[in-house]
Amino acid sequence: MKVLLTVIATATMLLAGQANAADGQALAQKSGCLACHSVDKKVLGPSYKDVAAKYKGDKGAEARLVEKVKKGGSGVWGPMPMPANSPQVKDEDIKTIVQWVLSL
């Protein structure tokens, strides 16, 4: 019985992770993020894989990136400023997108 519960719990977590990744990518598309970003190459802004690599292992990265996406800013990845995305993109959607980016 314990083995069955462990298998079910593990499968649930794996499927939830896949759903979050799909949700993050879909939200990035819907929110217009892909006008300036791409998963694997620089467009106007950095690629999402470059962002994930830069912040790999950084415990505070998610919170900082959520704020950066909300408020916008410049100077981190070059001279092109990132526009603020709040309130037009909901906070929970921004968090989902950032989690997806960091998972790449």
Roles of regions detected by a PLM:
Residues 44-53, 68-98:
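Axial heme c-ligation environment in periplasmic c-type cytochrome domains
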